Curated annotation (Swiss-Prot):
Binds 1 heme group covalently. It comes from Synechococcus sp. (strain CC9311). The keyword ATP-binding does not apply. NCBIfam families: PRK02693.1. Residues 1-23 form the signal peptide. It is found in: Cellular thylakoid membrane. Keywords: Electron transport, Heme, Iron, Membrane, Metal-binding, Photosynthesis, Signal, Thylakoid, Transmembrane, Transmembrane helix, Transport. The gene is petA. The keyword Kinase does not apply. The chain crosses the membrane at residues 277-297. Heme binds at residues 28, 48, 51-52. This is Cytochrome f. The lineage of its organism: Bacteria, Bacillati, Cyanobacteriota, Cyanophyceae, Synechococcales.
Length: 310
């Protein structure tokens, strides 16, 4: 039921976005929810890369170690030139949106809001978090949200406590992070978007360029054997060919309008046993005390030697 409500809510957001802001540029992390059981393939690739083909830098900052039942911040950085705009679905220039996915280790989850500090509340204003699925609460999605306001996305994370969950152990864990800016080049259905390069469907000469539906252009290539093959270029990408041009199969016939891209990385966090920390502090205290005692003893001996005239 929860998954159904989540899907319905996501669909409602999409519908409202489409009808209220048709010129917007979206980066939909939740599309992966509808098409993949897991956001990470066996090869390690995060599935967002199947639609967002361009590679762009994504960075992440997490603490080196955390204590059980503590809240910490995982920060995903999605840098890009905010002065750049991209093609919307209607061919107009629109600001980029961003999205991110953080795959936490089992047991780590989004921190409940009553555990958020004032700093975290301020840093996450306007950001909405979604679990990937009911059985994967450790995978958290964000987006689409305005990129010019959220080049850094803060994920408040609650560390598990092995004292209350026997399936959790102290030690080092991997975190998988993905960050995207802008629209994809391929829809989940496999169809190209208008935010990509279109290529010649065959070798031959361009015999016609005719207007299509919704501002599209239909490019016809006549091959050497007389066959005519068409390629429909949607509104947005600029044509690089004219009637009479000779093209090779697979050669670009439009520019590349994409200015966004996806990036992923792996990082690590240590779930630290507080007993080890207390033991280490006790050891350091013992060493410091021993050094102090040695210094005091040395001075005492020096005083005795001075009194005896040695």
């Amino acid at each position: 039921m929860r998954r159904l409500l989540s899907s319905t809510f996501a669909a409602l957001i999409v519908g409202l976005a489409v009808f209220s802001a048709p010129a917007a540029s979206w980066a939909y992390p939740f599309w992966a929810q509808q098409n993949y059981d897991s956001p990470r393939e066996a090869t390690g690739k995060i599935v967002c890369a199947n639609c967002h083909l361009a590679q762009k830098l994504t960075q992440a900052e997490v603490p080196q170690s955390v204590l059980p039942d503590s809240v910490f911040k995982a920060v995903v950085k999605i840098p890009y030139d905010t002065g750049v705009q991209e093609l919307g679905a209607d061919g107009s220039q629109v600001p980029l949106q961003v999205g991110a996915v953080v795959m936490l280790p089992d047991g780590f989850t989004l921190a409940p809001q009553d555990r958020w500090t004032d700093e975290i509340k301020e840093e996450t204003e306007g950001v909405y978090f979604t679990e990937y699925s009911d059985d994967q609460p450790n995978v958290i999605l964000v987006g689409p949200i305005p990129g010019d306001e959220h080049q850094e996305i803060v994920f408040p994370v609650l560390a598990p406590d092995p004292a209350t969950d026997s399936s959790i152990s102290f030690g080092k864990y991997s975190i998988h992070v993905g960050g995207n800016r802008g629209r994809g080049q391929v829809y989940p259905t496999g169809e190209k978007s208008n935010n990509t390069v279109y290529t010649a469907p065959a070798s031959g000469s361009v015999s016609a360029i005719e207007p299509g539906d919704n501002g599209a252009s239909v490019v016809t290539v006549k091959s050497a054997d007389g066959a005519e093959i068409t390629e429909t270029v949607p509104v947005g990408p600029a044509l690089l060919v004219s009637v009479g041009d000779v093209v090779e199969a697979g050669a670009p016939i439009t520019d590349d309008p994409n200015v966004g891209g996806f990036g992923q990385l792996d990082t690590e966090v240590v779930l630290q046993n507080p007993v080890r920390i207390y033991g280490m502090l006790a050891f350091f205290a013992a060493v410091a005390l021993a050094q102090i005692m040695l210094v005091l003893k040395k001075r005492q001996i020096e005083k005795v030697q001075a009194a005896e005239g040695v």
